[in-house]
Amino acid sequence: MQFLKCIECDYSGREYADQLGYIFNLEKNKASSTQKWLDNLEVSCRQRCNECSYKLTYQIDYKKAPEILVLEYPRTNIKSSHRIKIKIEDEYKVFSLKNVIYHGNNHFCSRIVSVDGTIWYNDGITTGNNSIEDGHLSTTSYEELKTCNGKILVLAIYA
């Protein structure tokens, strides 16, 4: 569910529920971690407030938890949290990091996180159909997740 909100005068507009998903731009966000960013989900829009003419935003509130979250990290320094939680009405749903995708030199590679936390590295060019064990999530820091073999983190998948 989303509704229009003015951060200048606290005006709230009508609700919308026709959106199946959202693309959030982390590039303009000042949050230091994925969790802090998700705590204040909002998307800017072109409409202006009827009361003060300030630019409105869509405030995002989930009524039902999504099954999967895919977050893009374009040129940001935000920490990719190992676990994140989203408030759904009066309860929280916890999502675990499942995959991190990296890009560099016109090529992608990824780290897949298994249920037990084992990290598996995959690069179709160098590993083919095989994945290589690459540590454990419990001993891997946020800093270590930012890069992989000279490539930078561009997507994180949570479920």
Regions inferred by a protein language model and the residue ranges of each:
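UBL (ubiquitin/ubiquitin-like) substrate-recognition surfaces
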Residues: 1-159
